Amino acid sequence: MLDDRNVLDDRKLAVLRAIVEDYVSTNEPVGSKALAERHKLGVSPATIRNDMVALEELGYIAQPHTSAGRVPTDKGYRLFVDRLSKVKPLSKAERRAIETFLSGALDLDEIVSRTVRLLAHLTRQVAIMQYPSLTRSSVQHLELVPLGPQRLMLVLITNTGRVEQRVIDGLAEVSDDVVENLRGALNRALVGKWLTEAPKEFPTVLAQLPLEERPIAESVMSVLTESLVEKHEGKVVFGGTANLAAMGFSAGLRDVLEALEENVVLIRLLGEMGDASMLTVRIGAENNHEGLQSTSIVAAGYGIGDQTLAKLGVVGPTRMDYPGTMGAVRAVARYVGQILAGQ
Protein backbone atom coordinates (compact mmCIF):
# COMPACT_ATOMS: atom_id res chain seq x y z
CA MET A 1 0.00 0.00 0.00
CA LEU A 2 1.35 3.41 -1.00
CA ASP A 3 2.24 5.65 1.95
CA ASP A 4 0.70 9.03 1.06
CA ARG A 5 3.32 10.71 3.24
CA ASN A 6 5.77 10.08 0.42
CA VAL A 7 3.80 12.27 -1.99
CA LEU A 8 3.97 15.36 0.22
CA ASP A 9 6.58 17.84 -0.94
CA ASP A 10 8.66 19.95 1.43
CA ARG A 11 6.32 22.93 1.14
CA LYS A 12 3.23 20.97 2.15
CA LEU A 13 5.17 19.48 5.05
CA ALA A 14 6.20 22.99 6.11
CA VAL A 15 2.56 24.10 5.94
CA LEU A 16 1.48 21.13 8.08
CA ARG A 17 4.21 21.86 10.61
CA ALA A 18 3.09 25.48 10.82
CA ILE A 19 -0.57 24.47 11.28
CA VAL A 20 0.30 22.09 14.12
CA GLU A 21 2.54 24.62 15.87
CA ASP A 22 -0.02 27.44 15.57
CA TYR A 23 -2.96 25.31 16.67
CA VAL A 24 -1.07 23.94 19.67
CA SER A 25 -0.07 27.48 20.60
CA THR A 26 -3.41 29.25 20.10
CA ASN A 27 -6.10 26.53 20.31
CA GLU A 28 -7.72 28.29 17.36
CA PRO A 29 -8.30 26.88 13.85
CA VAL A 30 -5.58 28.10 11.51
CA GLY A 31 -6.20 29.94 8.22
CA SER A 32 -3.95 30.52 5.22
CA LYS A 33 -3.67 34.26 5.83
CA ALA A 34 -2.49 33.75 9.40
CA LEU A 35 0.07 31.17 8.25
CA ALA A 36 1.44 33.58 5.64
CA GLU A 37 1.77 36.31 8.26
CA ARG A 38 3.31 34.22 11.06
CA HIS A 39 5.63 31.93 9.10
CA LYS A 40 8.21 32.57 6.41
CA LEU A 41 6.84 30.02 3.98
CA GLY A 42 7.91 32.01 0.92
CA VAL A 43 4.58 31.68 -0.91
CA SER A 44 1.30 33.57 -1.13
CA PRO A 45 -1.81 32.88 0.98
CA ALA A 46 -3.46 31.48 -2.16
CA THR A 47 -0.69 28.90 -2.60
CA ILE A 48 -0.89 28.01 1.08
CA ARG A 49 -4.64 27.62 0.70
CA ASN A 50 -4.12 25.14 -2.16
CA ASP A 51 -1.64 23.18 -0.04
CA MET A 52 -4.16 23.09 2.79
CA VAL A 53 -6.77 21.68 0.44
CA ALA A 54 -4.35 18.90 -0.51
CA LEU A 55 -3.52 18.20 3.13
CA GLU A 56 -7.22 18.05 3.97
CA GLU A 57 -7.94 15.64 1.12
CA LEU A 58 -5.20 13.36 2.45
CA GLY A 59 -6.65 13.50 5.97
CA TYR A 60 -3.88 15.43 7.73
CA ILE A 61 -6.05 18.44 8.63
CA ALA A 62 -9.79 19.02 8.98
CA GLN A 63 -12.25 21.90 9.08
CA PRO A 64 -14.32 22.38 12.24
CA HIS A 65 -17.95 23.13 11.43
CA THR A 66 -17.86 26.62 12.89
CA SER A 67 -14.61 27.89 11.42
CA ALA A 68 -12.98 28.72 8.13
CA GLY A 69 -9.64 27.61 9.56
CA ARG A 70 -8.20 24.10 9.79
CA VAL A 71 -6.99 21.92 12.65
CA PRO A 72 -4.65 18.90 12.63
CA THR A 73 -6.13 15.41 12.72
CA ASP A 74 -4.63 12.44 14.57
CA LYS A 75 -2.99 11.53 11.28
CA GLY A 76 -1.53 15.01 11.00
CA TYR A 77 -0.13 14.90 14.51
CA ARG A 78 1.37 11.48 13.80
CA LEU A 79 3.23 12.79 10.77
CA PHE A 80 4.36 15.82 12.77
CA VAL A 81 5.79 13.60 15.53
CA ASP A 82 7.39 11.10 13.14
CA ARG A 83 8.92 13.47 10.59
CA LEU A 84 8.51 17.14 11.36
CA SER A 85 9.48 17.64 15.00
CA LYS A 86 12.53 17.12 17.17
CA VAL A 87 12.60 16.40 20.88
CA LYS A 88 13.12 19.70 22.68
CA PRO A 89 15.93 19.49 25.25
CA LEU A 90 15.31 20.96 28.68
CA SER A 91 17.11 24.11 29.75
CA LYS A 92 19.97 23.98 32.26
CA ALA A 93 17.70 25.53 34.88
CA GLU A 94 15.03 22.87 34.27
CA ARG A 95 17.57 20.04 34.46
CA ARG A 96 19.01 21.46 37.66
CA ALA A 97 15.54 21.77 39.18
CA ILE A 98 14.72 18.15 38.29
CA GLU A 99 17.93 16.84 39.81
CA THR A 100 17.49 18.88 43.01
CA PHE A 101 13.85 17.91 43.46
CA LEU A 102 14.29 14.19 42.85
CA SER A 103 17.54 13.82 44.78
CA GLY A 104 15.72 14.78 47.98
CA ALA A 105 13.58 11.62 47.87
CA LEU A 106 14.33 9.15 50.65
CA ASP A 107 12.64 5.98 49.38
CA LEU A 108 10.79 4.54 46.41
CA ASP A 109 7.37 5.84 47.43
CA GLU A 110 8.73 9.36 47.65
CA ILE A 111 10.58 9.01 44.35
CA VAL A 112 7.31 8.03 42.64
CA SER A 113 5.36 10.80 44.37
CA ARG A 114 7.92 13.47 43.49
CA THR A 115 8.30 12.24 39.92
CA VAL A 116 4.57 12.44 39.23
CA ARG A 117 4.32 15.94 40.70
CA LEU A 118 7.40 17.10 38.80
CA LEU A 119 6.30 15.70 35.45
CA ALA A 120 2.80 17.15 35.78
CA HIS A 121 4.33 20.55 36.58
CA LEU A 122 6.83 20.48 33.71
CA THR A 123 4.36 19.41 31.03
CA ARG A 124 1.05 20.80 32.35
CA GLN A 125 -0.40 17.37 31.58
CA VAL A 126 -1.47 14.40 33.68
CA ALA A 127 1.61 12.45 34.77
CA ILE A 128 1.56 8.67 35.22
CA MET A 129 4.22 6.39 36.70
CA GLN A 130 4.37 2.65 37.14
CA TYR A 131 6.04 1.15 40.21
CA PRO A 132 9.05 -1.07 39.43
CA SER A 133 8.16 -4.74 39.39
CA LEU A 134 9.68 -6.92 42.08
CA THR A 135 10.57 -9.38 39.36
CA ARG A 136 13.08 -6.76 38.20
CA SER A 137 14.37 -5.77 41.65
CA SER A 138 17.16 -7.31 43.67
CA VAL A 139 18.29 -7.30 47.29
CA GLN A 140 20.73 -4.49 48.03
CA HIS A 141 21.01 -4.91 51.79
CA LEU A 142 19.35 -6.59 54.76
CA GLU A 143 19.61 -5.15 58.25
CA LEU A 144 18.55 -6.67 61.58
CA VAL A 145 18.13 -4.18 64.42
CA PRO A 146 17.62 -5.45 68.00
CA LEU A 147 14.68 -3.69 69.69
CA GLY A 148 14.80 -5.68 72.92
CA PRO A 149 15.62 -9.16 74.19
CA GLN A 150 12.84 -10.77 72.13
CA ARG A 151 12.25 -8.25 69.32
CA LEU A 152 14.01 -7.49 66.04
CA MET A 153 13.39 -5.04 63.24
CA LEU A 154 14.01 -6.41 59.75
CA VAL A 155 14.93 -3.80 57.12
CA LEU A 156 14.96 -4.85 53.45
CA ILE A 157 16.45 -2.44 50.89
CA THR A 158 16.22 -3.16 47.16
CA ASN A 159 18.26 -1.81 44.27
CA THR A 160 15.19 0.12 43.09
CA GLY A 161 14.92 2.10 46.30
CA ARG A 162 12.18 0.14 47.96
CA VAL A 163 12.56 -0.05 51.76
CA GLU A 164 10.51 -2.51 53.80
CA GLN A 165 10.57 -2.55 57.59
CA ARG A 166 9.00 -5.29 59.71
CA VAL A 167 9.06 -5.86 63.47
CA ILE A 168 9.43 -9.46 64.62
CA ASP A 169 8.03 -10.23 68.08
CA GLY A 170 7.95 -13.25 70.35
CA LEU A 171 11.46 -14.52 69.66
CA ALA A 172 13.56 -16.48 72.10
CA GLU A 173 16.11 -14.22 73.74
CA VAL A 174 18.41 -12.93 71.01
CA SER A 175 22.02 -11.99 71.72
CA ASP A 176 24.00 -9.47 69.70
CA ASP A 177 26.27 -12.27 68.47
CA VAL A 178 23.31 -14.24 67.10
CA VAL A 179 21.94 -11.14 65.34
CA GLU A 180 25.32 -10.38 63.79
CA ASN A 181 25.77 -13.96 62.63
CA LEU A 182 22.30 -14.11 61.05
CA ARG A 183 22.69 -10.69 59.43
CA GLY A 184 25.96 -11.75 57.83
CA ALA A 185 24.58 -15.07 56.58
CA LEU A 186 21.50 -13.41 55.04
CA ASN A 187 23.49 -10.71 53.26
CA ARG A 188 26.07 -13.16 51.92
CA ALA A 189 23.32 -15.35 50.48
CA LEU A 190 20.83 -12.74 49.26
CA VAL A 191 22.57 -9.51 48.20
CA GLY A 192 22.37 -9.21 44.42
CA LYS A 193 19.68 -11.89 44.12
CA TRP A 194 16.34 -11.10 42.46
CA LEU A 195 13.66 -10.71 45.11
CA THR A 196 11.59 -13.46 43.54
CA GLU A 197 14.58 -15.82 43.79
CA ALA A 198 15.59 -14.91 47.36
CA PRO A 199 13.47 -17.55 49.19
CA LYS A 200 15.31 -20.29 47.30
CA GLU A 201 18.46 -19.31 49.22
CA PHE A 202 16.92 -19.79 52.67
CA PRO A 203 17.94 -23.47 53.05
CA THR A 204 21.53 -22.45 52.32
CA VAL A 205 21.38 -19.81 55.06
CA LEU A 206 19.93 -22.25 57.59
CA ALA A 207 22.62 -24.80 56.82
CA GLN A 208 25.30 -22.26 57.78
CA LEU A 209 23.83 -21.61 61.23
CA PRO A 210 24.14 -23.58 64.49
CA LEU A 211 21.04 -25.61 65.36
CA GLU A 212 20.13 -23.40 68.32
CA GLU A 213 20.02 -20.29 66.07
CA ARG A 214 17.80 -21.78 63.38
CA PRO A 215 14.39 -21.14 65.03
CA ILE A 216 15.18 -17.41 65.15
CA ALA A 217 16.40 -17.52 61.55
CA GLU A 218 13.19 -19.27 60.44
CA SER A 219 11.08 -16.55 62.10
CA VAL A 220 13.10 -13.86 60.31
CA MET A 221 12.78 -15.69 56.98
CA SER A 222 9.03 -16.04 57.40
CA VAL A 223 8.66 -12.28 57.87
CA LEU A 224 11.10 -11.64 55.02
CA THR A 225 8.97 -13.79 52.71
CA GLU A 226 5.94 -11.63 53.56
CA SER A 227 8.01 -8.54 52.70
CA LEU A 228 8.66 -9.95 49.25
CA VAL A 229 4.96 -10.03 48.38
CA GLU A 230 4.15 -7.78 45.44
CA LYS A 231 2.78 -4.88 47.45
CA HIS A 232 3.07 -2.47 44.52
CA GLU A 233 3.10 -4.87 41.58
CA GLY A 234 1.35 -3.28 38.65
CA LYS A 235 0.49 -0.15 40.60
CA VAL A 236 0.32 3.05 38.56
CA VAL A 237 0.27 6.44 40.25
CA PHE A 238 -0.98 9.56 38.50
CA GLY A 239 -1.13 13.25 39.30
CA GLY A 240 -1.95 16.60 37.78
CA THR A 241 -5.57 15.87 36.92
CA ALA A 242 -6.31 19.53 37.65
CA ASN A 243 -4.39 20.27 34.45
CA LEU A 244 -7.19 18.60 32.47
CA ALA A 245 -9.48 21.56 33.12
CA ALA A 246 -7.13 23.86 31.20
CA MET A 247 -6.64 21.48 28.27
CA GLY A 248 -9.78 22.19 26.29
CA PHE A 249 -11.51 18.89 27.04
CA SER A 250 -15.27 19.24 27.22
CA ALA A 251 -17.58 16.32 26.54
CA GLY A 252 -14.72 13.82 26.81
CA LEU A 253 -13.39 15.00 30.18
CA ARG A 254 -15.42 12.52 32.23
CA ASP A 255 -14.33 9.62 30.00
CA VAL A 256 -10.67 10.59 30.45
CA LEU A 257 -11.01 10.88 34.23
CA GLU A 258 -12.79 7.53 34.48
CA ALA A 259 -10.08 5.85 32.41
CA LEU A 260 -7.35 7.33 34.61
CA GLU A 261 -9.08 6.00 37.73
CA GLU A 262 -8.89 2.41 36.42
CA ASN A 263 -5.49 1.05 37.38
CA VAL A 264 -5.85 -1.90 35.02
CA VAL A 265 -6.41 0.51 32.11
CA LEU A 266 -3.21 2.41 32.90
CA ILE A 267 -1.22 -0.81 33.29
CA ARG A 268 -2.46 -2.05 29.91
CA LEU A 269 -1.88 1.37 28.39
CA LEU A 270 1.76 1.51 29.45
CA GLY A 271 2.24 -2.11 28.46
CA GLU A 272 1.08 -1.29 24.93
CA MET A 273 3.51 1.61 24.55
CA GLY A 274 6.09 -0.43 22.66
CA ASP A 275 9.79 -0.86 23.42
CA ALA A 276 10.25 0.02 27.09
CA SER A 277 13.71 1.45 26.42
CA MET A 278 12.42 3.99 23.90
CA LEU A 279 10.37 7.17 24.00
CA THR A 280 6.93 6.27 22.61
CA VAL A 281 3.98 8.43 21.52
CA ARG A 282 0.41 7.16 21.03
CA ILE A 283 -2.01 9.63 19.45
CA GLY A 284 -5.81 9.72 19.63
CA ALA A 285 -7.42 6.63 18.16
CA GLU A 286 -4.10 4.75 18.43
CA ASN A 287 -5.08 4.31 22.10
CA ASN A 288 -7.26 1.24 22.38
CA HIS A 289 -9.26 2.42 25.39
CA GLU A 290 -12.26 4.39 24.15
CA GLY A 291 -12.09 6.88 27.01
CA LEU A 292 -8.59 7.92 25.99
CA GLN A 293 -9.10 8.34 22.26
CA SER A 294 -9.21 12.12 22.62
CA THR A 295 -5.76 12.06 24.24
CA SER A 296 -2.14 11.47 23.41
CA ILE A 297 0.23 9.54 25.64
CA VAL A 298 3.98 10.08 25.74
CA ALA A 299 5.90 7.44 27.72
CA ALA A 300 9.42 6.19 28.34
CA GLY A 301 10.97 3.39 30.32
CA TYR A 302 13.11 4.09 33.37
CA GLY A 303 15.57 1.88 35.13
CA ILE A 304 19.11 1.24 36.28
CA GLY A 305 21.78 1.06 33.60
CA ASP A 306 20.51 -1.07 30.74
CA GLN A 307 17.76 -2.64 32.87
CA THR A 308 14.32 -1.10 32.32
CA LEU A 309 12.20 -1.45 35.47
CA ALA A 310 8.92 0.21 34.50
CA LYS A 311 7.47 3.17 32.57
CA LEU A 312 6.41 6.73 33.19
CA GLY A 313 4.81 9.37 31.01
CA VAL A 314 2.03 11.86 30.53
CA VAL A 315 -1.54 11.89 29.24
CA GLY A 316 -2.85 15.03 27.58
CA PRO A 317 -4.90 16.32 24.67
CA THR A 318 -3.86 15.50 21.12
CA ARG A 319 -3.29 19.27 20.89
CA MET A 320 -0.03 18.83 22.76
CA ASP A 321 3.40 20.45 22.66
CA TYR A 322 4.97 17.20 21.48
CA PRO A 323 8.63 18.34 21.29
CA GLY A 324 8.54 19.85 24.79
CA THR A 325 6.57 17.00 26.33
CA MET A 326 8.81 14.35 24.79
CA GLY A 327 11.88 16.19 26.07
CA ALA A 328 10.49 16.41 29.61
CA VAL A 329 9.43 12.74 29.74
CA ARG A 330 12.80 11.55 28.44
CA ALA A 331 14.77 13.75 30.84
CA VAL A 332 12.73 12.80 33.91
CA ALA A 333 13.01 9.09 33.07
CA ARG A 334 16.79 9.43 32.87
CA TYR A 335 17.01 11.30 36.17
CA VAL A 336 14.81 8.73 37.93
CA GLY A 337 17.19 6.02 36.73
CA GLN A 338 20.16 7.96 38.08
CA ILE A 339 18.47 8.46 41.45
CA LEU A 340 17.65 4.74 41.72
CA ALA A 341 21.17 3.76 40.71
CA GLY A 342 22.65 6.04 43.36
CA GLN A 343 20.63 4.71 46.26
Swiss-Prot record:
The keyword Transferase does not apply. One of its GO terms (biological process) is negative regulation of DNA-templated transcription. It holds the Pfam family HrcA. Keywords: Repressor, Stress response, Transcription, Transcription regulation. GO terms for molecular function: DNA binding. Gene3D superfamilies: 3.30.450.40, Heat-inducible transcription repressor hrca homolog, domain 3 (3.30.390.60), Winged helix-like DNA-binding domain superfamily/Winged helix DNA-binding domain (1.10.10.10). InterPro entries: GAF-like_dom_sf (IPR029016), HrcA (IPR002571), HrcA_C (IPR021153), WH-like_DNA-bd_sf (IPR036388), WH_DNA-bd_sf (IPR036390), WHTH_HrcA_DNA-bd (IPR005104), WHTH_transcript_rep_HrcA_IDD (IPR023120). Negative regulator of class I heat shock genes (grpE-dnaK-dnaJ and groELS operons). Prevents heat-shock induction of these operons. HAMAP family: HrcA. Belongs to the HrcA family. This is Heat-inducible transcription repressor HrcA. It comes from Thermobifida fusca (strain YX).
